Amino acid sequence: LILLAGFIFHTIFLCVQYAALGTAPVLDLKSAFSFFSWCIVLVFLVFHLKFRIMVLGSFVAPFAAFLMIISSAIPWAAGPVKPIFKSIWLTFHVTTIFLGNGLFAITFVAAIMYLIQERQIKQKHFGSFYSRLPSLATLDSINHYALIWGFPFLTLGMITGSIYAQVALGSYWQWDPKEVWSLVTWLFYAALLHERLTVGWRGRRAAVMSIVCFCILLFTFVGATLWVKGYHDFSSIGTSGA
């Protein structure tokens, strides 16, 4: 209930931000972390309706809260929003990309839970924590469903991002560091999806690969933005990309 209440207030806050900015509220790093957190909680709530696994929230909530703590520690970016950022293509781009990220965060959490549960079973530690975690089959199913839905969102986000780049910059592809790392991320998740659907990857192997893929995604989200300069740089809301 606390997580749901927080999600509702967060949703209202994001709607107010969208109305004030006239575009998706992710033009600075502070807002990006906030929106990422919101997407993760949204995806968890949807998955909770299907799987009815409350303990999943015990892993998701700290991660989402950590993102909000980072967001709150970053000062607001100053400056007006350039008209070029008030594009419906930009809104489509960031919304689909972040929803994909939220779904992949669920694959990451499910993978961590899978490895914890698997270790408890192998070591025959059947305590209270073991009984609270779902079965290995259920955790693998959560991982699978999140991947199945996350990959199309990531793909759609990259397509709409290319369209926005053409509208804003005159080219579908700029070889921006974040574009390159987004492609790397896409290729890794494509490989994971291929192995799951055609080779039949399940269990530990899929869990480990999900963790690897999400680490690459996090580097794309933060590292490729902060450490390598490009037009996706979050340096200022009035002068940077999204």
Residue ranges and their predicted role:
Residues 81-89:
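Active-site-proximal inter-transmembrane loops
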